[in-house]
């Protein structure tokens, strides 16, 4: 397995797919990286030379990926919470942030149901 940005990428897959194993690189970014490096998307990782891997690494070093990107996202969320914005409050309460309905659904964000016991009459 080749290591790129601290991630072992699979050898048997096409390069364009393997690059998506790095956090922060999707299909579009992977295609742009390969175009800039002058490498075919159809090439398998096992067929890449060290020179080609080096070119890919150099391009990825200029992009914010993995730990740096995760840190930036968490700092952005923390900033929203500290300034007391609506989005920050939604993050703090563990509710959907982008205006989705939360009366009936939103179970992914809210977690499992917490049932409330009935009052005796």
Curated annotation (Swiss-Prot):
One of its GO terms (cellular component) is small ribosomal subunit. Residues 106-121 have a biased composition (Basic residues). GO terms for molecular function: rRNA binding; structural constituent of ribosome; tRNA binding. InterPro entries: Rbsml_uS13_C, Ribosomal_uS13, Ribosomal_uS13-like_H2TH, Ribosomal_uS13_bac-type, Ribosomal_uS13_CS. PANTHER family: 30S RIBOSOMAL PROTEIN S13/40S RIBOSOMAL PROTEIN S18, SMALL RIBOSOMAL SUBUNIT PROTEIN US13M. Pfam families: Ribosomal_S13. Belongs to the universal ribosomal protein uS13 family. Gene3D superfamilies: 1.10.8.50, 30s ribosomal protein s13, domain 2 (4.10.910.10). It comes from Bacillus cereus (strain ATCC 14579 / DSM 31 / CCUG 7414 / JCM 2152 / NBRC 15305 / NCIMB 9373 / NCTC 2599 / NRRL B-3711). This is Small ribosomal subunit protein uS13. Residues 91-121 are annotated as: Disordered. Part of the 30S ribosomal subunit. Forms a loose heterodimer with protein S19. Forms two bridges to the 50S subunit in the 70S ribosome. SUPFAM superfamilies: S13-like H2TH domain. GO terms for biological process: translation. Keywords: Ribonucleoprotein, Ribosomal protein, RNA-binding, rRNA-binding, tRNA-binding. Located at the top of the head of the 30S subunit, it contacts several helices of the 16S rRNA. In the 70S ribosome it contacts the 23S rRNA (bridge B1a) and protein L5 of the 50S subunit (bridge B1b), connecting the 2 subunits; these bridges are implicated in subunit movement. Contacts the tRNAs in the A and P-sites.
């Amino acid at each position: 397995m080749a290591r790129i940005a601290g991630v072992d990428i699979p050898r048997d897959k096409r390069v364009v797919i393997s690059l998506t194993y790095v956090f922060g690189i999707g299909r579009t970014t992977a295609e742009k990286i390969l175009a800039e490096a002058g490498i075919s998307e159809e090439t398998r990782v096992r067929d890449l030379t060290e020179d080609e891997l080096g070119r890919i690494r150099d391009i990825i070093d200029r992009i914010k990926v993995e730990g740096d990107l995760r840190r930036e996202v968490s700092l952005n969320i923390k900033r929203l919470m500290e300034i007391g914005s609506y989005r920050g409050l939604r993050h703090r309460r563990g509710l959907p942030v982008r205006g989705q309905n939360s009366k009936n659904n939103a179970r992914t964000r809210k977690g499992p149901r917490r049932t409330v016991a009935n009052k005796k009459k």
